């Protein structure tokens, strides 16, 4: 491992590959034409100033989730660390699924995580935001080249016949009756596909490789299909579209990507990736050396699902309030819950990159968040289950029931403030005759070891006075409605007499004089099962009925004045964030629980 700034960079197999390529000059002779292009375009360019090029290539057909966040941190982070650039590419080759709403949300998520797709080499600013659909002309040209070179053919079998003739792991495939067509026939038929003369599904263009290959992905995979659908970028210009496995390597090569990093499910596709780029380099359409694909294990996080289909089901069936529900593992959901970009980056670094699937405990993510917020989140007191505490001798000690005093406490503990850093101003809040305390901080008959309020016991109101409990009032059902105590004069925190009376405990409280009512949303895990959809289980059966509890709390004024998205540590309760959608709307004070002070996940 090496230390870079404050971040610990742990070596992994991808870093080792990149370092070896840099040491041996694998890509040192590359040219860069100033944007994506074919061999001739890059030949006319300059030596590539980027030592490596990676890419983050989502399909714009849904909201990004925590697994994508790992990939974003990996690809942008490697480019940053090795003097390269990471391309932001939308893999929008499927005309039926893409929506601009998703494009915008993805760009916003990447920037929120702390990354951008700009480069500035030698004073030349470039944006590397690309759309795969802008490469359709080249992809079509590449397909025609493969046909004329005898590497592709138009197949008019039914989908069912193609499936049967493909064979399986124990049985080789059977050649299509159309496989022996001449390149001239295939080219004419392919152009009829392009010109809309064939119905959807009537034919596909297939690569001509090996129907007996032990790798089923090399048994003449389909590379173009007929699909009449309006594309968000190209409109109705095309009625044929490339398959993802054909488009993806070409996109990488046009953009001069050096290290194409994918998840493990694409490992079996790598031989086709390499085969296709070798053919197109042979034909002079693309520049050698071509990109190489490397696979890593995707993120499996306990108590979380990341299937877009299943997440959409949660939204559509109103199991959650939307894609940004704070219980969702989407980046918009994590952001609204109160997770920080720094915590997610730390998490991605900490879990590392491996080639073997494993499960990461959710507590690891929460631990990274606590680590980030510990020194940043201002403290404040909030009472989540309030009961009134009446200081019965207040007027006797201070002259009137309406008298109040200011109390102060640090916004951040002194231990969290770095040397030379100016501490933030203290919080100021009022104490008076009536204050709010947690209901659990009073017991009429205390259990053994209980140190908080019970008749005759002495405790400190944190930042305020020492008090002695005298009793309580109850309603007809026997529920405590008020706790009664006497204030002990001369014991206020921060005054010379503060330690004159020893208190068994200090409890949090909020004054009735300036406390503000707040809606506090206590979020917990969305599922009760650590692997809710593993082994064919119905994930809906594992929904946690207690994943959201809403309480009316009382908070000190510094918390009520929070801006949306501002994070705090509610003393003793955990970390909370002012809700970015609802806080402040119509004067409402709304907080979400991000996580507790300790791990609650085991």
Q: Model-flagged regions — what are they?
A:
Residues 94, 100, 131, 145-311, ...:
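Active-site cores that bind ATP or allylic diphosphates and position pyrophosphate for catalysis
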Residues 288-368, 372:
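Long, charged, mostly alpha-helical binding arms that flank functional sites
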Residues 53-62, 85-93, 253-261, 325-331, ...:
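Glycine- and acidic
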């Amino acid at each position: 491992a090496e230390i870079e700034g404050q971040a610990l960079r742990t070596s992994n197999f991808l870093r080792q590959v990149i370092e070896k390529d840099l040491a041996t000059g694998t890509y040192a002779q590359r040219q860069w034409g100033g944007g994506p292009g074919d061999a001739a375009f890059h030949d006319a360019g300059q030596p590539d100033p980027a030592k490596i090029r990676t890419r983050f290539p989502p399909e714009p057909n849904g909201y990004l989730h925590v697994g994508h966040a790992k990939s974003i941190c990996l690809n942008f982070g490697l480019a940053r660390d090795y003097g390269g650039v990471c391309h932001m590419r939308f893999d929008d080759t499927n005309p039926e699924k893409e929506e601009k709403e998703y494009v915008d949300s993805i760009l916003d998520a990447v920037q929120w995580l702390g990354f951008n797709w700009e480069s500035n080499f030698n004073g030349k600013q470039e944006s590397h935001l690309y759309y795969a659909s802008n490469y359709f002309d080249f992809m079509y040209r590449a397909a025609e080249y493969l046909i004329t070179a005898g590497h592709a053919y138009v197949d008019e079998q039914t989908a069912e016949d193609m499936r049967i003739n493909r064979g399986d792991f124990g049985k080789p495939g059977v050649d299509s009756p159309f496989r022996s067509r001449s390149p001239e026939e295939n080219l004419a038929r392919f152009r009829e596909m392009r010109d809309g003369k064939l119905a959807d599904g009537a034919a596909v263009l297939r690569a001509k490789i090996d129907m007996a290959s032990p790798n089923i992905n090399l048994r003449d995979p389909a590379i173009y299909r007929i699909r009449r659908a309006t594309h968000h970028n190209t409109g109705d210009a095309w009625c044929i579209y490339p398959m993802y496995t054909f488009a993806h390597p070409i996109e990488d090569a046009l953009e001069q990507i050096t290290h194409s990093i994918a998840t493990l499910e694409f490992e079996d596709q790598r031989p086709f990736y390499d085969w296709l780029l070798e053919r197109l380099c042979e034909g002079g359409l693309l520049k050698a050396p071509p990109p190489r694909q490397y696979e890593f294990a995707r993120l499996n996080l306990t108590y979380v699902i990341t299937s877009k289909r299943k997440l959409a089901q949660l939204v559509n069936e109103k199991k959650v309030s939307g894609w940004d529900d704070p219980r969702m593992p989407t980046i918009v959901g994590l952001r609204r819950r109160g997770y920080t970009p720094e915590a997610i980056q730390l998490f991605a670094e900490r879990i590392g990159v491996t080639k073997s699937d494993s499960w990461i405990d959710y507590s690891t993510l929460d631990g990274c968040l606590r680590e980030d917020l510990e020194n940043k989140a201002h403290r404040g007191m909030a009472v989540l289950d309030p009961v009134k505490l009446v200081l019965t001798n207040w007027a006797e000690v201070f002259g009137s029931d309406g008298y109040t005093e200011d109390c102060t406490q640090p916004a951040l503990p002194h231990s969290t403030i770095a040397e030379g850093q100016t501490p933030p101003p203290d919080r100021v809040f009022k104490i008076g005759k009536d204050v709010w305390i947690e209901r659990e901080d009073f017991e009429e008959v205390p259990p053994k070891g209980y140190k908080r309020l019970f008749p005759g016991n002495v405790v400190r109101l944190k930042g305020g006075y020492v008090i002695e409990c005298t009793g309580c009032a109850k309603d007809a059902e026997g529920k405590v409605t008020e706790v009664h105590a006497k204030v002990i004069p001369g014991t206020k925190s921060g005054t010379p007499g503060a330690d004159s009376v020893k208190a068994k405990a200090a409890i949090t409280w909020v004054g009735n004089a300036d406390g503000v009512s707040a809606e506090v949303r206590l979020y917990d895990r969305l599922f009760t099962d650590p692997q809710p959809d593993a082994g064919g289980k119905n994930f809906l059966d594992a929904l946690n009925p207690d994943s959201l509890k809403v309480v009316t709390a009382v908070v000190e004024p510094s918390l009520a004045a929070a801006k949306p998205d501002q994070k705090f540590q509610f003393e003793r309760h955990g970390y909370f964030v002012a809700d970015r959608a609802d806080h402040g709307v119509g004067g409402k004070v709304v907080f979400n629980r991000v996580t507790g002070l300790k791990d609650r996940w085991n």
